[in-house]
Amino acid sequence: MAAFARRKAERLARPDPSRKRALDARAAELARLLNGRETFCTASSCDGRVLVLDTDGAGVQKKNCRWLLVTHGTCVKDDVMTALEKATGDVVFKFEPFVFHVLCRELQDAQLLHSVAVDSGFRNSGITVGRGGKITMAVRSTHCLEVPLSHKGRLMVSEEYIDFLVHIANQKMEENIRRIERFHKGLELALEAAIPADTLAPKGPEKSHSVYVHRRKRRSTREQADPSRELEPQDDPESSLDLFAEP
């Protein structure tokens, strides 16, 4: 416990390494909520964004690119067209969804976050246990979008198609925001329940099961009592804990 507290203090004292030098607004709210608890420490994050990147075609976008446009909300076609006027290489239009990494003191703490994340629609969320027992919970999803627009500065698609892409990206952003809001509300409720970490894991042979699985069992009981209830998107019964060790 002392080691986690020391690691948390060191991490929170570091300057923000991102281009923005600050957390995005929605991630900042979640960070304040979690960092106020001794069992959590937030790491890297992004609210989700729409990007227009000018790359050199080498395939390593993060190292060989210029950001022609970036927004953490919805965008309009005219902004994309204006950004394309500055293009000289291979331009890519992207939507990247919310991602949020949290260091957790105990595995049970990570399981609690995982349960809330999956319930909120972030079904690709997972837990990793690294060297030295460092536990990281990653909130993430797969509703990305990446489309090439130009090659060597030459536009390869129509303006009408760009308008269509912007519409799709905005739909994804709106759904992304709804999921973040569900995650935030669910997290507040879970933390307010104030269940001690050592009571989250069941006893006996079932100990290795995730909290999420046991919540599913209780929910199934309610659903049997009300067979007319339809499953919502976040009620996917196939969702499960993604727990694996880093090499």
Regions found by a protein language model. Name each.
Residues 1-92, 164-247:
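N-terminal, charge-rich interaction modules
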Residues 33, 101, 113-116:
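Alpha-helical recognition domains of nuclear gene-regulatory proteins
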Residues 93-97:
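Short glycine-enriched loop/turn motifs at secondary-structure junctions
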Residues 98-104:
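Short cationic amphipathic helices and targeting signals
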Residues 105-109:
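Helix N-cap motif at beta-to-alpha junctions
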Residues 112, 116-207:
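Helix-rich interaction surfaces within compact, conserved domain-sized segments
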